[in-house]
């Protein structure tokens, strides 16, 4: 997909958004093209990471007649989500502040069959000479109190533009199918609790 097409898609996404605060709308009004471009760069970074895992999966299929990856999911944090996180962490509401201060704008989730595949794939990814590890959090060996388990990596990878190379951060989450199911149930439970609390306050 061409960068121009990605920019157009992001612009349409901005137009459809209607739940932003006045402060966020003012930021976008002043920085709409830089923000669009930044989001497009994150989408490009996601494509790079997805390609790396697809290549690894294909290699294992050819050499060992099995696929360690069950599925690959990706997402870009919403504008409202970016803004709320910036406010919560006192990150400057600027393009530079957002890019430097929020590490999980771009996310890729790799669902594996077995726990050992998680560490094997993480090692394969980090051995690649264009991948830089920024942060590692192992919630498999050290689960959260809720029971949530996953391996989180923040990495930097290059995207190659027309006239430059730009390093972009991507959060990569590794889970088994069972871990992903538990995370989904936990997320729904938290969302339901927040909704009930809001309804109670409203009454």
Q: What are the language-model segments listed below?
A:
Residues 193-202:
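Conserved small/polar residues in nucleotide/adenosyl-binding loops
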Residues 158-189:
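Conserved, surface-exposed functional patches that form binding/active-site neighborhoods
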């Amino acid at each position: 997909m061409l960068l121009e097409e990605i920019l157009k898609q992001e612009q349409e996404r901005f137009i459809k958004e209607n739940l932003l605060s006045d402060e966020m709308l003012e930021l976008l009004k002043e920085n709409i093209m830089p923000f669009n471009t930044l989001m497009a760069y994150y989408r490009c970074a996601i494509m790079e990471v997805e390609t790396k895992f697809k290549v690894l999966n294909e290699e294992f299929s050819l050499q060992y007649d099995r696929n360690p990856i069950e599925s690959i999911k990706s997402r870009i944090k919403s504008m409202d989500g970016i803004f709320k996180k910036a406010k919560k962490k006192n990150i400057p509401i600027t393009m530079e502040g957002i890019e430097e201060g929020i590490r999980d704008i771009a996310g890729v989730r790799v669902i594996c069959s077995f726990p050992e595949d998680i560490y094997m794939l993480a090692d394969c990814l980090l051995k690649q000479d264009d991948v830089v590890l920024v942060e590692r959090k192992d919630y498999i060996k050290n689960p959260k109190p809720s029971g949530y388990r996953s391996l989180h990596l923040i990495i930097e990878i290059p995207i190659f533009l027309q006239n430059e190379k730009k390093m972009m951060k991507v959060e990569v989450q590794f889970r088994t199918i069972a871990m992903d199911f538990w995370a989904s149930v936990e997320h729904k439970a938290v969302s339901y609790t927040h909704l009930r609390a809001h309804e109670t306050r409203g009454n």
